[in-house]
Amino acid sequence: MKLLLMSRIDSEETLAYTRTLGIDLENVGFQIIYDTATASALEVNGVPLSSADPDAVVAIGGDGTILLCIQQMNIQRPIIGINRGEVGFLADLEPEEAFSFLKELKPGFPVERRMRIDLSVDGKPLGTALNEAVIVTSRPAKMLRFSVLVDGVRAEQFRGDGLLISTPTGSTAYAMSAGGPIIDPRIEGFLLVPLAPYMLSSRPHLICATRTLAVRLEASKPAHLVLDGQRTIDLGDQATIEMTRSPEPAQFIDVNRNFFSKVEQKLRNL
């Protein structure tokens, strides 16, 4: 089997761990390749993640590394994260157990598919998010005015600092910090969480993933759209952001662990 290793490159300890893990996996018969950035840091040959064809991808770092990895894949490959960050809700393995798990990986391993969101602005495709898309004001202390449309029908109108649109996977990330609920990732839907809404009646909404969702900026105030904390797009006046369930979900290697048990453990360690 061919595994691609992608490491956070701002940590010498993580890079050293990645180098050792790659050697150990090669010694038990795996073909190991590295993405370009990791390879450069390790001074070995690498391949762009966008054109690589591994059987699985191993992301070594925090949730940001895993999100970046998924963003860079043109075709979604099975992925597993090794936590070398702070919390690591998306990382299913800790460093001390990773080699023992990976060396037993065989073709046909189980995969859990996670919903992603395709986004466009005024009809122009922008990209895909696994955790969340966040619409925020570009000017601190200046509120935005939104309309939320579901299948073309206005369902909500409010003012606030911004609006967070999350997947169930992202419900343990920014959405949780903003007061949203924790959602089982096997559920598919759009979680809308207002950020500092002016009216207390503006509450989180969970909308079925089969619906088409749009958010319209109702006033001419500068705003940004941020995808998974990785990419920021300037929004024009009175822009409309359209969202649909992506036909290509993320694929996480299933380690057969209870989601809520993992969440409880991660939250306890905060």
UniProtKB/Swiss-Prot annotation:
One GO molecular-function entry: ATP binding
Signal peptide interval: none
Alphabetical UniProt keywords: ATP-binding, Cytoplasm, Kinase, NAD, NADP, Nucleotide-binding, Transferase
Domain of life: Archaea
Pfam families, per database record: NAD_kinase (PF01513), NAD_kinase_C (PF20143)
Major localization listed first in the record, in broad terms: cytoplasm
GO CC annotation terms, alphabetical: cytoplasm
Swiss-Prot/TrEMBL catalytic activity: NAD(+) + ATP = ADP + NADP(+) + H(+)
EC numbers for this chain: 2.7.1.23
Spans through the membrane: none
Broad EC category: transferase
GO terms of biological process kind: NAD metabolic process; NADP biosynthetic process
Residues reported to bind NAD(+): 63-64, 131-132, 142, 159, 161, 172-177, 196, 230
Co-factor(s): a divalent metal cation
Protein family according to the UniProt entry: Belongs to the NAD kinase family.
Protein name per its UniProtKB record: NAD kinase
Species of the source: Methanosphaerula palustris (strain ATCC BAA-1556 / DSM 19958 / E1-9c)
